[in-house]
């Protein structure tokens, strides 16, 4: 907890999934790089990935009750007011204990109570804490839409996400904050080490496959189903199938390996080992894959409101990847479309260059500077 008011105190709220947590932690790192005396505290829930990711990155984590916002009318709507009150109450305790100067929200289960708790409360008995909102997705969620109405600054990855500050037609477009270990990655320099780490051959094309932190059955089935074709074409595979899934791919005698793992904890090495990737198109995934300049086959999650396809469109429009519908991804597609790409170094190089050009490598630092500026303006008026 922060009792020294000469020290900047920042609350980052973005728990639940890696897509909310990683941008928050990237901004936290960037704030510390600018002001190493700053205290950054993360809000999260007991059931989110933040219980692992936040401590690993060295930041204090304060848990609050989650507030899932149903997209459609369900019985959960009846429970929502009570959940919100409990979560806001707990969040206010954290804001007071840390002496928070600014709240930075990235959407997710903890963002809404953070936005509400930062307000002055009934009869304006509390100090108002300024809010900065960052929307990573191409279509904003409910929490960030509510937060944007109260925010000092509203930032977004792409135009037209549906959030903006008062008096503006759109958010400030900065891209998605990505950790420095990814934006500064030199894939070619790490290639030999990365391939040795995973037991992949030093030469020849490598296909990276992952479906998010929990894997993706359709990606698993399509790529493993093309294992013989991939091996025959001399393509090695690094495939993260998800901790709840299994993948048994017989080794091809004399052929390149098909390395199947539940989870990839060293994404920097995975990206460095690969020549192309098949993956979902969550906002954070698209940001990282484009930042490192990897050609990608994006397979949007076939649920929700089509946000994942929207996330991938800018990179695809720039020529850095392609989109294939989940239902169209098959072993045949891998054999007929992905293998020829992996066997074409010139096309891989061109797509990689275009992907890198579509990314925003400085987003974390830019967001951090805005957060510090917003906090300074408020601190100066106290």
From Swiss-Prot:
EC number per UniProt: 2.4.1.227
Gene Ontology MF term list: UDP-N-acetyl-D-glucosamine:N-acetylmuramoyl-L-alanyl-D-glutamyl-meso-2,6-diaminopimelyl-D-alanyl-D-alanine-diphosphoundecaprenol 4-beta-N-acetylglucosaminlytransferase activity; undecaprenyldiphospho-muramoylpentapeptide beta-N-acetylglucosaminyltransferase activity
Catalytically driven reaction(s): di-trans,octa-cis-undecaprenyl diphospho-N-acetyl-alpha-D-muramoyl-L-alanyl-D-glutamyl-meso-2,6-diaminopimeloyl-D-alanyl-D-alanine + UDP-N-acetyl-alpha-D-glucosamine = di-trans,octa-cis-undecaprenyl diphospho-[N-acetyl-alpha-D-glucosaminyl-(1->4)]-N-acetyl-alpha-D-muramoyl-L-alanyl-D-glutamyl-meso-2,6-diaminopimeloyl-D-alanyl-D-alanine + UDP + H(+)
InterPro entries noted in UniProt = GlcNAc_MurG, Glyco_trans_28_C, GlycoTrans_28_N
Report the locations given in the UniProt record: Cell membrane
Keywords assigned: Cell cycle, Cell division, Cell membrane, Cell shape, Cell wall biogenesis/degradation, Glycosyltransferase, Membrane, Peptidoglycan synthesis, Transferase
Task: Tell me how this protein sits in the membrane.
Answer: Peripheral membrane protein
Q: Which residues bind UDP-N-acetyl-alpha-D-glucosamine?
A: 17-19, 137, 179, 213, 308
Q: Gene3D superfamilies from the xrefs?
A: Glycogen Phosphorylase B (3.40.50.2000)
Q: Which pairs are disulfide-linked?
A: none
Quote the PANTHER family the UniProt record gives: GLYCOSYLTRANSFERASE, UDP-N-ACETYLGLUCOSAMINE--N-ACETYLMURAMYL-(PENTAPEPTIDE) PYROPHOSPHORYL-UNDECAPRENOL N-ACETYLGLUCOSAMINE TRANSFERASE 1
Q: Report the sequence similarity comment from the record.
A: Belongs to the glycosyltransferase 28 family. MurG subfamily.
Function, as annotated, reads: Cell wall formation. Catalyzes the transfer of a GlcNAc subunit on undecaprenyl-pyrophosphoryl-MurNAc-pentapeptide (lipid intermediate I) to form undecaprenyl-pyrophosphoryl-MurNAc-(pentapeptide)GlcNAc (lipid intermediate II).
User: What name has this protein been given in UniProt?
Assistant: UDP-N-acetylglucosamine--N-acetylmuramyl-(pentapeptide) pyrophosphoryl-undecaprenol N-acetylglucosamine transferase
**Organism whose genome encodes this protein:** Rhodococcus opacus (strain B4)
């Amino acid at each position: 907890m922060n009792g020294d008011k000469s020290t900047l105190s920042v609350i980052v709220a973005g728990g639940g999934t890696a897509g909310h947590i990683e941008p928050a932690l990237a901004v936290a790192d960037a704030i510390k790089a600018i002001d190493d005396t700053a205290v950054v505290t993360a809000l999260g829930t007991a059931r989110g990935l933040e219980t692992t990711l936040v401590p690993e990155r060295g930041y204090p984590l304060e848990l609050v009750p989650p507030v899932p916002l149903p997209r459609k009318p369900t019985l959960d709507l009846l429970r929502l007011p009570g959940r919100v009150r409990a979560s806001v109450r707990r969040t206010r305790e954290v804001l007071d204990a840390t002496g928070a100067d600014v709240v930075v929200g990235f959407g997710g289960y903890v963002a809404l109570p953070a936005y509400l708790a930062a307000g002055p409360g009934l009869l304006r008995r509390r100090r108002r804490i300024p809010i900065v909102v960052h929307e990573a997705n191409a279509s904003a969620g409910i929490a960030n839409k509510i937060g944007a109405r109260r925010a000092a600054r509203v930032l977004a990855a792409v135009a037209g996400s549906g959030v903006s500050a008062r008096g503006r037609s759109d958010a400030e477009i900065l891209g998605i904050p990505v950790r420095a270990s990814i934006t500064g990655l030199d894939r070619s320099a790490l290639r030999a080490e990365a391939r040795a780490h995973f037991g992949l051959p030093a030469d020849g094309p490598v296909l990276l496959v992952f479906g998010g932190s929990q894997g993706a059955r359709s990606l698993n089935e399509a790529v493993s189903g093309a294992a013989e074709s991939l091996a025959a074409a001399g393509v090695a595979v690094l495939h993260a199938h998800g901790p709840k899934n299994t993948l048994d791919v017989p080794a091809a005698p004399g052929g390149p390996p098909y390395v199947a793992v539940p989870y990839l904890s060293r994404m920097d090495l995975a990206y460095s080992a690969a020549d192309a990737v098949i993956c979902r198109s969550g906002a954070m995934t698209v940001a990282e894959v484009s930042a490192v300049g990897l050609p990608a086959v994006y397979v949007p999650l076939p649920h929700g409101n089509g946000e994942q396809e929207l996330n991938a469109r800018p990179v695809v429009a720039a020529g850095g990847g392609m989109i294939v519908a989940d239902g169209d991804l098959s072993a045949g597609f891998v054999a007929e479309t992905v293998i020829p790409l992996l066997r074409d170094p010139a096309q891989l190089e061109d797509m990689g260059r275009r992907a890198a050009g579509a990314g925003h490598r400085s987003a974390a630092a830019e967001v951090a500077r805005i957060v510090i500026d917003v906090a300074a303006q408020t601190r100066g008026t106290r």
